[in-house]
């Protein structure tokens, strides 16, 4: 007799979601209209607040997670989740700048508090090692709002020509293009095919022994430099120095989280949760890492932003403070608070100056690091371990590991992200 085939039990298909329904963090179907229902953590928090009792940190985290999960907008095939961190800049920035334009003292208080609040939020998220769209939202909305104030309050006064407006608009467009390019893949490392899972010596060598062609020659990997007065021949071959140095170094090159062997200068970003080739740092302003593939676009975005910002500041000051130099008008502009339009423009100028000064500092640090062929992660590591050569009170840090001279360092930076032709190790001097 033929064996009777058992019929497979068909799983019931999930019904499509309507525009107001969604799957919550518990895996259950929920509705936007029920966002205020079943809020036990919020009820507990309100009760403890009304009775003057301290709120436990885990309760605050659960309340935040619940709010962020239920904050959604109706959309096709289910309600879409709105990241709550993008909302504060959209609401607070226009309100605070308009309040600051009421009086000189209010402007001092508000413009002093804004950087402090931003730094506090940065250290809060940095300590928790989590991604946030707050700074990206703040940057993009600041660009848009400054441009809006310029069109509404400065251009109608008739002192800005069409060519100047077109040049400023072009600069803003180029900033957005460079930011889009900088937010793309910074050079994430893919996991090589290897079945071994633990970072023992034999298992670390597995990707090289079994699939040397796979791990060999990562695109754009730094292939030259001097370490202890000798050339890194293994870097010239495009592979990590695993299996050739000490076991301690082999374990250092192995990433237990990504289960791969990192090439030279690559590092695991704890915020993004992945390894990045030639990682410089994690930039909160683009909510992404700055690595081998997007470092050039990051520098380009900074340079265009600085030029456009300085140009916009000069146009605004020449309009609201006539017949005065830029530096004098920035600190002494009599009658600027006489009307609302000039007061708001002057407040936005000072806000732009604060942002521009911060970006100029980042740009200066980047130029110094590129000139010495070091990444920001290598600089911080050298400062912690008290290694390398420090100049100008630590502003300049030269590890001496990859420094090949000013021109060669910039030439190497200009070719980041391109697939280079590796020369034999015997030809490298």
Swiss-Prot record:
The record's annotation in Pfam families points to: DHHC
Ranges in the topological domain labelled Cytoplasmic: 1-81, 125-130, 181-296, 369-429
Catalytic reaction(s) noted: L-cysteinyl-[protein] + hexadecanoyl-CoA = S-hexadecanoyl-L-cysteinyl-[protein] + CoA
Annotated GO molecular function terms are: protein-cysteine S-palmitoyltransferase activity
Please classify the protein's predominant subcellular localization into one broad category: Golgi
GO BP field: protein localization to plasma membrane; protein targeting to membrane
Coiled-coil ranges (or none)? none
Tell me which parts of the chain lie in the Lumenal compartment. 103, 152-159, 318-347
For this protein, the parts annotated as crossing the membrane are 82-102, 104-124, 131-151, 160-180, 297-317, 348-368
Region feature (Interaction with NOS1) = 426-429
EC number(s) in its UniProt entry?
Answer: 2.3.1.225
The residue ranges flagged as biased composition, category Polar residues, are 221-230
| Membrane topology reported for the UniProt record | Multi-pass membrane protein
Leader sequence residues? none
The domain of life for this entry's organism is Eukaryota
Q: Does the keyword Acyltransferase apply?
A: yes
Which GO cellular component term is one of those annotated?
A: endoplasmic reticulum
Q: Using the UniProt record, name the top-level EC class of this enzyme in a single word.
A: transferase
Keyword check for Transferase: yes
**Active site, UniProt feature:** 283 (s-palmitoyl cysteine intermediate)
Where, subcellularly, is it found?
Golgi apparatus membrane; Golgi apparatus, trans-Golgi network membrane
- What is written about domains in the entry's comments? The DHHC domain is required for palmitoyltransferase activity.
Q: What does this protein do?
A: Palmitoyltransferase that could catalyze the addition of palmitate onto various protein substrates and be involved in a variety of cellular processes. Palmitoyltransferase that mediates palmitoylation of KCNMA1, regulating localization of KCNMA1 to the plasma membrane. May be involved in NOS1 regulation and targeting to the synaptic membrane.
The family assignment reads: Belongs to the DHHC palmitoyltransferase family.
Quaternary structure, from the entry: Interacts with NOS1.
The name under which this protein is listed is Palmitoyltransferase ZDHHC23
Report the source organism: Rattus norvegicus (Rat)
Q: What is the lineage of its organism?
A: Eukaryota, Metazoa, Chordata, Craniata, Vertebrata
């Amino acid at each position: 007799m033929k064996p009777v085939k058992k019929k497979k039990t068909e799983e019931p298909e999930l019904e499509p979601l309507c525009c107001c329904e969604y799957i919550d963090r518990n895996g259950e179907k929920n509705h936007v209209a029920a966002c205020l229902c079943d809020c036990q953590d919020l009820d507990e928090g309100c009760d403890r607040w009304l009775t003057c009792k301290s709120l436990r940190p885990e309760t605050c985290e659960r309340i935040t997670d619940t709010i962020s999960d239920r904050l959604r907008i109706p959309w096709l095939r289910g309600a879409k989740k709105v990241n709550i961190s993008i909302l504060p800049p959209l609401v607070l920035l226009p309100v605070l700048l308009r309040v600051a334009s009421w009086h000189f003292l209010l402007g001092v208080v508000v413009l002093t508090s804004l950087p402090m609040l931003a730094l506090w939020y940065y250290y809060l998220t940095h300590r928790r090692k989590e991604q946030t769209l707050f700074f990206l939202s703040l940057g993009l909305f600041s660009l848009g709002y400054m441009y809006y104030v310029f069109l509404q309050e400065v251009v109608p006064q008739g002192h800005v020509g069409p060519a100047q407006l077109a040049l400023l608009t072009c600069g803003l467009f180029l900033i957005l293009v460079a930011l889009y390019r900088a937010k793309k893949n910074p050079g994430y490392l893919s996991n090589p095919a290897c079945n071994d899972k633990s970072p023992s010596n034999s298992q670390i060598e597995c990707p090289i022994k079994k699939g040397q062609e796979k791990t060999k020659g990562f695109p754009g990997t730094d292939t030259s430099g001097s370490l202890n007065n000798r050339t890194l021949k293994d870097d010239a071959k495009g592979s990590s120095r695993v299996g050739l140095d000490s076991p301690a170094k082999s374990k250092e090159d192995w990433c237990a989280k990504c289960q791969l062997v990192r090439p030279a200068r690559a590092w695991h970003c704890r915020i993004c949760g992945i390894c990045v080739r030639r990682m410089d740092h994690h930039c909160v302003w683009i909510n992404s890492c700055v690595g081998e593939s997007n470092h050039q676009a990051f520098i380009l975005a900074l340079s265009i932003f600085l030029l456009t910002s300085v140009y916009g500041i000069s146009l605004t000051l020449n309009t609201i403070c006539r017949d005065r130099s830029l530096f004098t008008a920035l600190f002494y502009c009599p009658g600027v608070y006489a009307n609302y339009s000039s007061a708001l423009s002057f407040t936005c100028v000072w806000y732009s100056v604060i942002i521009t000064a911060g970006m100029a500092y980042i740009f200066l640090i980047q130029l110094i690091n590129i000139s010495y062929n070091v990444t920001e992660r290598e600089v911080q590591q050298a400062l912690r371990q008290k290694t390398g050569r420090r100049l100008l009170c630590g502003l300049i840090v030269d590890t001496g590991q990859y420094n090949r001279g000013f021109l060669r360092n910039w030439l190497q930076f200009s070719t980041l992200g391109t697939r280079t032709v590796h020369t034999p190790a015997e030809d490298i001097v």
